[in-house]
Every structure is written in C-alpha cells, then in structure tokens.
Design a protein with these regions (language model features):
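Vicinal oxygen chelate
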Residues: 1-14, 24-124, 135-145
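C-terminal catalytic core of tyrosine-transesterase DNA break-rejoin enzymes
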Residues: 127
Length: 145
C-alpha cells in the first residue's frame, strides 16, 4: 500500500464551476481563500488552487473539464444536491458567517453551537456547491466526559 505524501494537505477537494474566474474572486472575498495559482486562458480556467490555512481546494471551468472533470457534475445538474462537501475549520465561526452572508452566500444551516463541540454553519456558493464552516477541530484532543 502506498503511504501518504509528506506534504501540508493530502486530501484536496476538487470543484468545477461554470464561471470559474468569477468564483475564484468570490471564494476569496466570501470565505477568505487566497489564490495560490491560477492557470487560465481568457475566461477558461484550466486549473486553480486556493488556500485557506494549511488546506487547499482545486477548481477549474466546466468548459475545460478534461477526462477527470467530465466525471464531476454541477450541483444544479442533479437537483441542487451534493454527494460531498468541504468542511473548513475557522477560528471565529460567527465572524466567518457574517463575512459569507455579506458576500451573498446562501445559508443552508444557520450558525449554531454543535453537540460535538464548536460552532458552525452550512452554506451554498453562487453555483450551489455546499460548504461547512465551523470552529470544531476534529484533530484536537477530545473533551473529557
């Protein structure tokens, strides 16, 4: 069996967007991502990497899907549903929530304290990809009962 690579993040969600260039800017404004790299020709994004802390998402244009991207559909193509979503750990869930709402994110689950710890909320971006943001850190030591 192959071992994980010795790198910052070994699991990186990949997304496809109809207007990837606009979504890159929106994800940075609304969620606080930072551009790591963007390979584009005109409006067509071949590949982009956005970072948040030590995590990353990769994305590209639906019009340039290639063999791998053809297996990935837009949420609106399947009734607005997702088969998976990114969960992002933030230090201040309330401040992040306010930032996302101000940028026009659609709130799916309002911000609340979670029974397993932390505070969080779920939202959709303008192209209906679902995101979870919260302060619960699954890597932290469990609280003593």
């Amino acid at each position: 069996m192959s071992k994980p690579a010795n790198t910052t993040s070994t699991i990186i969600p990949c997304l496809r967007y109809r207007n990837a260039l606009a979504m890159i800017d929106w994800l940075c404004e609304a969620f606080g991502f930072q551009k790591h790299t963007v390979y584009a020709e005109g409006d067509n994004v071949h590949h982009a990497q956005l970072v948040f802390g030590n995590g990353m998402v990769m994305l590209g244009s639906t019009s340039n899907a290639g063999e791998w991207g053809q297996a990935i559909v837009q949420p609106e193509e399947i009734g607005g549903r997702e088969t998976q979503s990114a969960c992002v750990i933030v230090t201040d869930a309330d401040a992040h929530y306010a930032r996302a709402v101000a940028a026009g994110a659609t709130i799916v689950i309002d911000i609340a304290d979670q029974p397993y710890g932390g505070r969080g909320y779920a939202c959709k971006d303008p192209e209906s990809h679902h995101w979870w943001f919260g302060s619960y850190d699954p890597w932290a030591e469990p609280a003593q009962a």
